[in-house]
């Protein structure tokens, strides 16, 4: 036994070492993905006996998981998504059974399409750039960077103040995120803006002192022409006081009341006086821009505060009508009109151009001479004069709504940090960041610069630069919305057989949609067995353009709990039920055929009752004759014994013999072992049908864990995360588990052989019971009884010890591997001796880390996880004890029953040995191959020794130079006759 065990241990050690290094190599080079997520020791309900698996997958928005290398102009390579692999399903590596519950949570943000510059945008319309308002000079659509794209600045669109109409800046779908900002007012410097349509930078002079600016300068004016800037007094400016002149020589002149009816003779001619008047001093609008803000209008959301009409200001009434030099003048009134507003209010009296007995106040006009609106917005509230609206049609129009929405700067805390330069000055300042939450599928965000409707906007000057970032088709945490494509963004799943790949199978599947709650959580029961595959629903049209334009990913956290497959139900029950049925059927058939029980055709069998009757008659006649002739003496005890024998044997001649054996003795004897084993182990052997299942229920826990638990495999592999010591732990534990498996299989083989032998012995019971009659055949009956009892007891004795040892093994196995396991960084790679070269701070810093199964909470830096070597040693001792107890129990039963001969233990051990040799033969590890190798090695060694001996002899007989032999024997003297 010891030699066989050593062979088994050697084989298991070699296999374990190979498995260890193979998995370590695979983990290091990343050739396979052994697992992911976590395998929990206990289910969420705190109970064991199930695989509670948690895992996380990354679900890409573009549904592309294959990268290819692309050569860049500088000679370097870059990984890019394979252009032919968009829109594919992702295997989550979560294997489920039918009706298995799965809990998941979707976390993350994705953008499922890319925003492009819309038609009729703030820079060009279809009327100014027919058919190309949204295309660059090369005819391509112009993409808008996403909000999360920190590597690219926002897209700039130039807004000219001459365009007095609503224009689009963004096409918005449901739940879109948009960030509209305005470039600053470039004061006393040049402005440079990237023209999105030309693809080049545009630079213009924006320094102060000018009256006309390009739109990129960040300032505009709606004023043009001239306005009255000051008032000047002019004497004798116009002919005023139109009246008659009086003839003083007639009736004392006009003062005597000469009636005008007398005409010229009385009153004289019509004449005018020469009067002074305040005349307008005009200057051009707008006045030159100044950086000090003296000519800049403050931000306001009231149009009455935005514009003051300077066109209608006059120093005096009718001042716009110049004197014609005639009497009377074209106008009769040139009295002061806006003099106080323009010139200032005189606290005394104006005498011509002098303020007598008073002072002149500051002209109110100075408070209204604000000709410029700037993107900075004087006062810092927003870009002055910029208004916006939402329009579902996206059409260009000039109509103003009754209520205007003026753009404002968002709070400083909401301004992106990358929108400032290194000095903290804003490169762009956000004016709109409101998510588009609407029931409409699509709408447009429009902007325009405010301009008085009474004026010709084509004479305006300047403008603003609007900048935009837009995250289109935005979804988060697995939520979906309808836009131009129904249910865009819904996470879908299909369950596919392990042998299928839905991306290449060509089959049509019926995806199931995930309706997550507000936290992104969803629960479902698998509708079939297989792997879960997932992807995000998106518009597949236009050659998968939306998939190709998508960006971002979801983290899908899985948790599922599946009861570990029962070794008893999946393996032992089918095996033993089939075996028992066949063996019991064969045994009963033997019995029935021996007695021709209910045989319709007696020619097919020979009724053994006939022989029993003949033997019984012969026995009675012979013994009666001997008794009458005095050859046989009989006492009372012997008489009773012989009558009992005759009674038992004669009972076999009854036609109901088979029913008696089948209903009372057969099941009682064959199930004797099962019932006792069940009582010893404490496991019920009865199923819902109240029939005995099998006696190996005590193996269910440990064998189910070993063969069907994914958690156990992960726990075992996690020992490798301890490095070199972990390899030793892994090999020892693997060997212990292997010994237990072999022992369990040997126990099953012993049970099978004992059960089969018992059934056969019961099947031929009529034959051996008839041997009870004669003394010279009595030993056959006695041996039949001994072997029947031996094969009934042998499984009981064997299982009694294995039950105890199995329970101990299960406990210690949980001591060794009783922890949750996660796939994570487990084996850090560090630079050796770095502490002698670099500062001590870098001593424990890994260069990179190899992912592997590692215990929950394990610190990969220290590599400690608290494995107790005592428990591992105890595990091996228990496994070794189980292996040896199988043969020990066979010897024990042989002594107890005094039945010499083959035992079920020996036969079962031979069966398991032959099976093991068959499994080892393909790799050359079976006994026959090893003996052949050993024999050939011994033969080669013997041949080598012979060759060496022959070479030594030849060397001794080789003559030296000069003809002498080396090591030659001295010549013998010649014999004398």
UniProtKB/Swiss-Prot annotation:
<keyword id="KW-1003">Cell membrane</keyword>
<feature type="transmembrane region" description="Helical">
    <location>
        <begin position="833"/>
        <end position="853"/>
    </location>
</feature>
<keyword id="KW-0472">Membrane</keyword>
<feature type="signal peptide">
    <location>
        <begin position="1"/>
        <end position="24"/>
    </location>
</feature>
<keyword id="KW-1133">Transmembrane helix</keyword>
<feature type="transmembrane region" description="Helical">
    <location>
        <begin position="722"/>
        <end position="742"/>
    </location>
</feature>
<protein>
    <recommendedName>
        <fullName>Uncharacterized protein RF_0091</fullName>
    </recommendedName>
</protein>
<keyword id="KW-0812">Transmembrane</keyword>
<keyword id="KW-0732">Signal</keyword>
<feature type="transmembrane region" description="Helical">
    <location>
        <begin position="866"/>
        <end position="886"/>
    </location>
</feature>
<comment type="similarity">
    <text>Belongs to the TrbL/VirB6 family.</text>
</comment>
<feature type="transmembrane region" description="Helical">
    <location>
        <begin position="612"/>
        <end position="632"/>
    </location>
</feature>
<dbReference type="Pfam" id="PF04610">
    <property type="entry name" value="TrbL"/>
</dbReference>
<feature type="compositionally biased region" description="Basic and acidic residues">
    <location>
        <begin position="937"/>
        <end position="967"/>
    </location>
</feature>
<feature type="region of interest" description="Disordered">
    <location>
        <begin position="125"/>
        <end position="146"/>
    </location>
</feature>
<dbReference type="GO" id="GO:0005886">
    <property type="term" value="C:plasma membrane"/>
</dbReference>
<feature type="region of interest" description="Disordered">
    <location>
        <begin position="918"/>
        <end position="977"/>
    </location>
</feature>
<feature type="transmembrane region" description="Helical">
    <location>
        <begin position="754"/>
        <end position="774"/>
    </location>
</feature>
<dbReference type="InterPro" id="IPR023298">
    <property type="entry name" value="ATPase_P-typ_TM_dom_sf"/>
</dbReference>
<dbReference type="GO" id="GO:0030255">
    <property type="term" value="P:protein secretion by the type IV secretion system"/>
</dbReference>
<feature type="transmembrane region" description="Helical">
    <location>
        <begin position="796"/>
        <end position="816"/>
    </location>
</feature>
<dbReference type="InterPro" id="IPR007688">
    <property type="entry name" value="Conjugal_tfr_TrbL/VirB6"/>
</dbReference>
